[in-house]
A protein has these predicted regions:
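Active-site and donor-binding regions of nucleotide-sugar-utilizing enzymes
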Residues: 1-149
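Donor nucleotide-activated moiety binding/catalytic core segment of transferases
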Residues: 32-48, 209-251
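Tryptophan-centric aromatic hotspots in well-structured domains and transmembrane helices
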Residues: 10-13, 71-75, 172, 176, ...
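C-terminal amphipathic helix plus adjacent low-complexity
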Residues: 150, 292-339
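A donor-sugar binding/catalytic signature common to diverse glycosyltransferases
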Residues: 51-65, 70-75, 229-274
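Short, charged/polar "capping" segments at the starts of alpha-helices
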Residues: 16-23, 120-122, 180, 210-216, ...
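Catalytic binding pocket for nucleotide-activated donors in carbohydrate/polymer assembly enzymes
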Residues: 218, 248-315
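Conserved catalytic-core segment of nucleotide-activated headgroup transferases in glycan assembly
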Residues: 1-5, 126, 134-217, 289, ...
């Protein structure tokens, strides 16, 4: 926004773990999204001309927008392997009051930003919206991956932090599971991974911020546990191999066209309880394993495949490094029309 000379009065409510360079963004007022600031959040939701959200916010259910106000859902991922919204399997277990609130929140999304036609179809089913709600301008969060000099800088920076030297970096970033709020259990056999790969690789572990586990016990010469609050976009340039399961990370990492493996040890259970997208096994751009032994063998025998490039092209169709610019142009137009 600032680069384009567009600096309207902007209020940003954020999770307290996120830090910003407030000096560079002097036109933005940053407020932690906590109980103490809840009344301010409600005030600005009711008085702003343009509202950007990136997740489900129950507060929207209590807001009645005036004519001309537009709430735009940016979402926090440019693709989805697990179901959400009305597609989430757990919806059937929620109360009538919950479902009424979900409906009220989703109806406030006048536009939803998408990076692909595939994700647009998922949003239509998940939020019960139609084609006119879709803003096909690309996903702003992917713009950084098209800045080659920045990505090269990040790769060098993080490899130095990892003391990678001549070793390659494997990132294991499992998705969040609802039962991990109390205590998480990592199924991967880290000893077996170390025996198999310690000569040529480092294993970087990146867990969801909500996961509770004694990570200090996992730090070895082979395993590096990254702080939960480190943003993934900071890390991906330094990664040579990604291991995940049902998270949205592959949709961004595919832009690098580097190998992705899916350690989906609880696939049937997860699909039953939470729900995976249809044809999950056909859509993902890499092999599935359900045991560490299978995973090790797959990594050892990996081959170059065109699947990754095709996957990235399909799911990042509208994301070309200029999505943020198009978003700013769109917001500027909305603000001018609202005068």
């Amino acid at each position: 926004m600032k680069k384009m000379g567009y600096t309207p009065n902007t209020i940003c409510f954020h999770t307290e773990r996120v830090q910003f360079n407030t000096k560079e963004l002097d036109f933005v007022r940053f407020l932690p999204n906590n109980l103490a600031n809840k009344w301010k959040l409600m005030f600005y939701l009711n008085t702003s001309k343009v509202i950007l959200v990136d997740n489900y916010y129950p507060e929207l259910a209590a807001v009645s927008f005036k004519d001309g106000v537009e709430c735009i859902q940016l979402w926090h991922a440019n693709g989805a392997l697990k179901q959400f919204g009305w597609e989430d399997n757990s919806i059937s277990e929620r109360s009538d009051a919950d479902r009424k609130r979900f409906k009220a929140v989703y109806e406030h999304f006048l536009k939803v930003v998408v990076g692909s036609d595939e994700m647009g179809e998922i949003f239509k089913r998940s939020f019960l919206i139609n084609e006119s709600h879709l803003l096909k301008i690309g996903v702003p969060r992917t713009d950084v991956y098209f800045e080659e000099s920045l990505q090269q800088q990040k790769r060098i920076e993080w490899r130095n932090k990892f003391h990678a030297e001549n070793k390659k970096v494997i990132l294991y970033a499992p998705t969040f599971r609802d039962n991990e709020l109390a205590e998480a259990k990592l199924v991967m056999d880290f000893n077996a991974m170390e025996r198999a790969f310690s000569e040529d690789y480092l294993l970087v572990l990146k867990l969801h911020p909500a996961v509770k586990i004694d990570v200090q016990s996992l730090n070895t010469d082979f395993i590096i546990n990254v702080d939960k609050n480190v943003a993934l976009e900071e890390l991906l340039a330094a990664v040579d191999i990604l291991i995940t399961d049902y998270s949205s990370i592959p949709f961004e990492f595919a832009l690098f066209e580097r190998p992705i493996f899916f350690f989906s040890y609880d696939m049937e259970k997860y699909d039953k309880e939470r729900g995976l997208i249809k044809n999950y096994q056909e859509i993902i751009p890499g092999p599935i394993s359900q045991t560490t032994a299978e995973l090790i063998e797959q990594i050892k025998t990996k081959t170059t495949s065109e699947t990754l490039a095709l996957f990235s092209k399909k799911w990042n169709k509208y994301s070309d490094g200029h999505a943020s610019e198009r978003m700013v142009v769109y917001m500027k137009q909305l603000m001018e029309e609202a005068k």
